[in-house]
Amino acid sequence: MSAFPASPQPSAFPASPQPSAFPASPQPSASPVSPRHCVSPSSGTLPSSSSPSVSSCALRGLSSSSSALSRPPFSSFPASPAFSRRCMLTESEMGKTRSLKWLRFRCILGACLLHFCLGGSHTIGNLLPYLIGFIRNAQATSAVSYKDGLSIYAWAIICQGVGGFLGTTLEKKAGTKKTAFLGSAWMTLGLALCGVCTHDLSLFLIAYGVVTALGCGVAYPVPLAATLKLSPAEDKGWVSGLLFFARGLSVCILCPFQSFFLHQPPEVFLSLIPAPLLPYLSSVASDTASASRLSSLNGKRAAPLPSPGGERFLTDQAVLDRLPALFFVMAGVFACIQLLGVLLLVDPERTSAADEAAADAAERQKLLYEDPQGASRASAGRSSSCSASQVFASLVLTPQDICSSPSFWRLFLMLLLSWQSLFFVQLFWKVLPLYPEASLAASAAAPAPLDSLFASVVRRVPRALASASRPDPRALHAAADAWSLTGSSWSFANDFFLSCLGGLLGALCCFGRLLWGYIGGGIGYMRSTVVMNALTAPCLFALSTYALQSPQLYAACLALVHVCHGGIFSLFPSVTSDLFGHKNVGPVFSLLFAARLAAVALAAIWINIALTYGNLHMVVGALGVCHLVSIGTTFFFHPTDALPYRFPTYSP
């Protein structure tokens, strides 16, 4: 006899199933079989009949509908241990997800607080008139002028770039929170030193342009990198935009705050009141109290003395003496905000975000190997839809490859030309009306004189209130600020008006980043750079002539320039991605950052020379030509120029 039992005979499975062989309801002793064993999940066919239980399951699927309806429901089957473990894992994963969301919220909030303080370094343009006036009064000399502020801001930008490199390197060794704390403390120390060194230009350059800027640079990339590591890929766009918004918000808040602190009530409120309304508002109080208050204000404020070059400087000693205290207050407030931001900041390496990312990668790899045909079909579809330039741009390039690419040097030239106007406008936006060219432009406008408006207001006031004993409001308002001496059309302008304008310009620059990103997605990023430069050039040409005829034209011109400058931050990274591929955006743009440093260093030199031996018209004219040259550079781009010379596809 054979050692193995005989195989079942074909007669055991008749051609047509008999009703008696398959009862209507299953026996209680029969073990339930999961429906997932009836059909193979991979092929969709019935499994092999080598197992009796599987064979009976397959045949029961062919039974009548009455037998299927008589089966017990799925809930009557006992829960398997694997199902219970899956439920426990699901609850654990939900807890981890909630914890990770809280960590992301903490990290984003802390990063926003840190970037809010870092944005305070861009308010040097608002403080430049006070700084130069304080140094001139302290040294009793007229050798210092507004063009000397170019070296301060240029050193600040260069040291911020160096500090960013140091911060990235230090983060890998010391961690996120320690690096952010070190940069924040260094920045706070620099602001405190600025309060001590305001009497000397060289010392202030070291305190603000080196110490404070290095602290800003060290602390700048750390919170941004931490939030991006904790955020999923679909949220990285709005998270980075939120941090940039926090930096712009600091300019909007700090510029009016600085003016408010330096002037202090009641001076700041009286300087806000237009000249025709001063007699009516002063008559509300007693005549003697109002007259004494206005006369004391008139005695404390003196008309700024013009320099040999025609520039006007602030000479109010009561206001200038508060400048060192302002830096001490800013250092104290920033120290508290930055300490809170560092405490809220989260180190991504100590969270489970990296583990979850690794698990997701392992899951994707598992799915790839389980369905290799689907993966190959997807990759084939992607490769068929990509153009040749996109395939070449997806290559990973080395620094030597990037520097040998003609497209890299064209982008370098465009950034070098565009950044010079941004550097000049961000520093000189408040002092341009104090140049003699502004007075000439305002006199050419010939607006309605102030006396006519003043007379119309006085006629509506009872004669008893318009006594001759009160001081002349026009003379009082003219002596209030140096900007009101620009011309009759600038008579209502004062420091607080210009400070509020600076806050608005900071908000418009942030809005410009979003606007040009949206425009670039519609018409293309390279075409958007052409439109952006075409709008910026005429505004710069008119900045020293027509724009200075009135504060309204000046504000409108600066607003358009700042909106266009916002496109520099959003369009050039996108252009870099289009030319070199998303894999090379980081290395290419890191090398392109040298164009920013070279631009501010070059602009600080030639603008200083142009203002010394020329005038303001030469400076803004040259800056407008830079944007026209940038437009011409865009027509020399070619998709294959992004490839280095070592690739055979690039050789002719």
Swiss-Prot record:
Cytoplasmic side: 1-45, 536-652
GO annotation, biological process: amino acid transmembrane transport; pyruvate transmembrane transport
UniProt cross-references to InterPro entries, sorted A to Z: MFS_Riboflavin_Transporter, MFS_trans_sf
Keywords, in A-Z order: Apicoplast, Membrane, Plastid, Pyruvate, Transmembrane, Transmembrane helix, Transport
Stretches that traverse the bilayer: 46-66, 126-146, 167-187, 189-209, 212-232, 278-298, 345-365, 385-405, 417-437, 445-465, 467-487, 515-535
SUPFAM superfamilies: MFS general substrate transporter
Region feature Disordered, mapped onto this chain: 1-53
CC per GO annotation: apicoplast membrane
Subcellular localization: Plastid, Apicoplast; Membrane
Membrane topology classification: Multi-pass membrane protein
Function: Along with apicoplast pyruvate carrier 1, forms apicoplast pyruvate carrier (APC) complex, which transports pyruvate into the apicoplast and may also transport amino acids like methionine, serine, glycine and tryptophan with low efficiency. Required for maintaining pyruvate-dependent metabolic activities in the apicoplast, such as synthesis of fatty acids, isopentenyl pyrophosphate (IPP), dimethylallyl pyrophosphate (DMAPP) and methylerythritol 4-phosphate (MEP). Required for maintaining the integrity of the apicoplast. Required for normal parasite growth.
Subunit structure: Interacts with apicoplast pyruvate carrier 1.
Similarity remark: Belongs to the major facilitator superfamily.
Name this protein carries in UniProt: Apicoplast pyruvate carrier 2
Organism, as annotated: Toxoplasma gondii
